[in-house]
């Protein structure tokens, strides 16, 4: 492999391509003369669009094909949305860089209403995320929630066609695709706790590829890594996946980190919440400790019930 060339495996969706183009531009800015190639490909999660994510099941729906490309030396790195990245990596691969986080909140998108509280009784809301469904149902049990799959453009088209009164999307995706004007309002983390890693971009590569790791190093954003490590550690201890409503959100003030987490019933009938504060350098320990607290408060029975049905 040329010392001056790097190949990026990416999904084909507009948002995934934006993320890959962002990494490409950063590498070209930091390393003048470098040749960066994009290798767009489809993943299982991109192909199976007629089934709710929770039913498709399995971890790594949006990353496996990219990982195979790296293991086969067809690509040097893969760029991921962190909320899609499983906890465990195939042997020989690892998460080398986490880039600076975009807005991690959920966005309320509607052509008719400004917020969830403004929605009329029995309004239809689109989201495929059990985490979002759980929190919406807890505050507005009257709303009808319908599954919503596809890329951002497809989801917006379904809203515009009148299939939904409102849809919930990650704010980061809309901002990156220059679609901020579609956001009727941002949903605060207090109202809808984000998914772990939401809004952050991660870069995976072969762990023994020192050339590539050196090229990637300047893209690392340490504060984002601490936040995402804590959120992922909580999720790992809870053995979270698409089938369970789990939210995790870390914030940093100076050297202190505050991590909030929740586990809920998909129907919103029960939500277990917790919060923990400690040194940001102990991000992983904080995540595990908060998970243990949630389990002791009753999250274990919720998780056991959900996985028994899966």
From Swiss-Prot:
It catalyses: 4 porphobilinogen + H2O = hydroxymethylbilane + 4 NH4(+). CDD domains: PBP2_EcHMBS_like (cd13646). One of its GO terms (cellular component) is cytoplasm. Pathway: Porphyrin-containing compound metabolism; protoporphyrin-IX biosynthesis; coproporphyrinogen-III from 5-aminolevulinate: step 2/4. PROSITE patterns: PORPHOBILINOGEN_DEAM (PS00533). Its EC number is 2.5.1.61. InterPro entries: HemC, Porphobilin_deaminase_cofac_BS, Porphobilin_deaminase_N, Porphobilinogen_deaminase_C, Porphobilinogen_deaminase_C_sf. NCBIfam families: hemC. Belongs to the HMBS family. This is Porphobilinogen deaminase. The gene is hemC.
